[in-house]
A protein has these predicted regions:
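S-adenosyl-L-methionine
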Residues: 268-311
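Mobile active-site "lid"/loop adjacent to the S-adenosyl-L-methionine
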Residues: 292, 308-337
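C-terminal catalytic and target-recognition region of SAM-dependent MTase-like enzymes
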Residues: 306, 333, 347-409
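Non-catalytic accessory regions of SAM-dependent methyltransferases
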Residues: 1-122, 126-128
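Non-catalytic substrate-recognition/targeting regions of SAM-dependent transferases
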Residues: 112-125, 141-219
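Conserved SAM-binding motif I beta-strand of class I
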Residues: 259-264
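Conserved SAM-binding loop of SAM-dependent methyltransferases across substrates and taxa
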Residues: 245-258
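Conserved class I S-adenosyl-L-methionine
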Residues: 235-244
C-alpha cells in the first residue's frame, strides 16, 4: 500500500535513523501530495531512501512514526501485532494477577503507553474487565473502532490470567491536540458496557472513574511508588499532599501508619479519597483525616515536626517549556517547606509528573530547597514510572515521572 510521501531536508533523517519516532515540522522539505491531519504518510530522506511510516499531524510534531520498516502495512493486523506484544510485556512482568491469585491481586495496569509500546499517540489502561482507550493524535482517533475491536479479540484469545473484556471505553475529549479535533469526538463505549467497580492494585482496592476522573480514571503510574510508601509508613504520622484519589494514603494505612492526613484543595478529591478509605477500612477509620485546603497554605501554617513522612505529588506545574521557570519555583517552594517542617529522621517523597521538566532540573530544584532548609538531607531512592509505562530508549521524552525519596535529619 502506498501513502503520500514526505521528504526530509538533508541531514534531518539522523534522529529517525536512531529510531526516534518524532519528526518535527521544520525537518520536512516536500510532500508528494496534499496531506491532512491524521493521514498516514511514508517518510524518506533527502535522497529518497525510505525511513518509515506514520501519522501526520499539523503541529510542531509533524509525524509520529508507527514503523521504521517502510514495507510494513499499517492495517488491522499491524495493530493486533502491536497489542499482542504489549500484552506479552505485561505478562512477562507478572503484572496481571486475578483476584483468586495467591499473590496480591492486581487487576489494573497500562497496556499501551504510546511511544513506549511503539504506538505513539495511543494510551490504553485496563481496569479489570474494562479497557479505557485514549487518543492523543487524530490518526489514532480515526482508527479507534479498529483498535477497540482488535483489543477485544486479543483479550478473548489470551487465556489465563488475562480476563476477557466486557467493555472498551473511549476517553479522548480532553486529549486530542486541538479544539477542532476535540469537537469531533465524544467519550463513550466503543464495544460492550461496564459500570465502575472496585479494582485491585497490589491487593489494595480502588474504584476508577473513567467517566469523570482525570487521565483514564486513575493514576496507575504511581503504583510502585505507592508500594514504596507502604515500606516506610508503619508507625509514622503521614501527610499526603495533593492527594487526589488518596492512593498513597490507602497504602500508608494498610502498612500501619499511626495517622494519615490527606490534603487537597478539591472537595471532589477529598470525596474520592474518603470513598477509597471506606472501601478498604470501612466507614469509620480513626487513623485517617481529610483536609480540604490549598496545599501551599497548609504546608506554610502546619507546625514543625507534625509529620515524619510527607508525600508531595502535585499536578503538573509545567505542561510546556514556556512556563518552566514558574514550575521550578513551585517545586523549590513546596520542597523547601517540607524540608523545614518534617520531623527529624523524617522521610519526604517528592514527585514531578511534568514532561517539560527534566530529571536534572527537578533534582536541582529539590537540591536548592534542601540547601535553603539548612538541614542534612540524603537521597534514599530515585523514582520513575513503573514497567507498564515503559520508556523507549530511543525516545527519552517518554520518561515524564520523576521522584526522590529523601531522609531529613
Amino acid at each position: 500500500m502506498s501513502y503520500p510521501t514526505l521528504r526530509l531536508h538533508p541531514r534531518k533523517e539522523e534522529s529517525v535513523l536512531r529510531f526516534h519516532p518524532w519528526i518535527f515540522s521544520g525537518a520536512i522539505a516536500t510532500f508528494s501530495a496534499p496531506v491532512e491531519d491524521g493521514d498516514l504518510v511514508s517518510v524518506v530522506d533527502s535522497k529518497g531512501r525510505p525511513l518509515g511510516t506514520g501519522y501526520f499531524g499539523g503541529g510542531s510534531i509533524a509525524v509520529r512514526l508507527l514503523s521504521f520498516d517502510a514495507e510494513e502495512i499499517i492495517d488491522r493486523a499491524f495493530y493486533k501485532r502491536r497489542l499482542e506484544a504489549a500484552l506479552r510485556l505485561r505478562l512477562s512482568c507478572n503484572l496481571i494477577r486475578p483476584v483468586d491469585s495467591s499473590d496480591s491481586p492486581n487487576t489494573t495496569y497500562r497496556l499501551v503507553h504510546g511511544e513506549g509500546d511503539s504506538l505513539p499517540g495511543l494510551i490504553i489502561d485496563i481496569y479489570d474487565r474494562t479497557a479505557v482507550v485514549q487518543a492523543h493524535s487524530l490518526g489514532m482517533h480515526q482508527v479507534r473502532q479498529t483498535i477497540a475491536e482488535v483489543l477485544w479479540e486479543v483479550f478473548a484469545e489470551a487465556g489465563d490470567p488475562v480476563l476477557p473484556l466486557e467493555g472498551v471505553y473511549y476517553k479522548s475529549e480532553t486529549t486530542l491536540p486541538t479544539r477542532d479535533m476535540r469537537e469531533l469526538t465524544s467519550d463513550g463505549f466503543l464495544i460492550g458496557h461496564t459500570e465502575a467497580a472496585p479494582i485491585y492494585e497490589n491487593g489494595v482496592r480502588f474504584t476508577p472513574d473513567w467517566l469523570k476522573g482525570q487521565k483514564t480514571g486513575f493514576f496507575i503510574d504511581q503504583r510502585d511508588n505507592r508500594a514504596l510508601v507502604a515500606h516506610y509508613a508503619k508507625g509514622r504520622t503521614v501527610l499526603n499532599a495533593f492527594c487526589y484519589t488518596g492512593g498513597f494514603s490507602i497504602y500508608a494505612l494498610h502498612a500501619g501508619a499511626k495517622r494519615v492526613d490527606s490534603l487537597d484543595s478539591s472537595a471532589k478529591a477529598m470525596y474520592l479519597t474518603e470513598q477509597h478509605v471506606a472501601l478498604n477500612f470501612g466507614a469509620d477509620c480513626p487513623r485517617h483525616h481529610s483536609v480540604t485546603e490549598d496545599a501551599f497554605d497548609y504546608l506554610e501554617r502546619m507546625p514543625e515536626g507534625e509529620y515524619d513522612l510527607i508525600i508531595l505529588d502535585p499536578p503538573a506545574f509545567a505542561k510546556h517549556r514556556k512556563v518552566l521557570r514558574n514550575a521550578l519555583i513551585g517545586y523549590r517552594k513546596i520542597n523547601s517547606i517540607a524540608f523545614k517542617k518534617v520531623a527529624p529522621g523524617g522521610i519526604v517523597f517528592t514527585f514531578s509528573c511534568s514532561q517539560a521538566v527534566s530529571k536534572e532540573e527537578f533534582r536541582l530544584a529539590v537540591f536548592t530547597a534542601a540547601a535553603a532548609s539548612g538541614r542534612k538531607v540524603r537521597i534514599l531512592h530515585q523514582l520513575t514510572q513503573p514497567v507498564d509505562h515503559p520508556i523507549n530508549i530511543y525516545h527519552p521524552e517518554g520518561e515524564y515521572l520523576k521522584g526522590l525519596v529523601l531522609y531529613v535529619e
